[in-house]
């Protein structure tokens, strides 16, 4: 009998829901099961860490919850919409309206300045004051002196600050962060995480954080642990940030 670890949240609205989620991929040796029987609910404004050893399925789960990929079985709901019913264009529209991303690799556009990188999602959303809004966000993350710098002119920590400003630019309902400090030294990583949680609280954004760092995970309100593609624990943390 399949165990269920879905938490009942104390938030007003369920922002993300997964029902009997599974993901399999074909390989030369046969079918590889990456995720199986995932049941999960994440409430509005909640901060949730997804932890587990390398290969446990953390990043795959994040990709499914964010609509970057489709499951082999089960269903995913994001911001009240069932992603299984949508093609890639439809899922992209949901992501554009509701979701922000912060990745380990920053993923800034090399040909754009820091300011232009943050302005881009605002302009795509049709915001008239994109420049002023982007400037304010970059000032907020401590990059006021780096507006006209290109990514190659920025340190790793500076690039991640720009990436965080870009992620929060459209005030997404949900922010997905996949190992956001993985390429940074400990001191810089701690400052980036402080910034991420500060903005998360200020904006009331739902935060889903994939990490192998147990100390970082402990700063979230809730911890979901994966082993071999299954949820084996789902609990509140003692001292959320």
Q: What would you call each of these model-derived segments?
A:
Residues 16-228:
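ABC family nucleotide-binding domain
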Residues 1-24, 233-241:
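ABC-family P-loop ATPase nucleotide-binding domain
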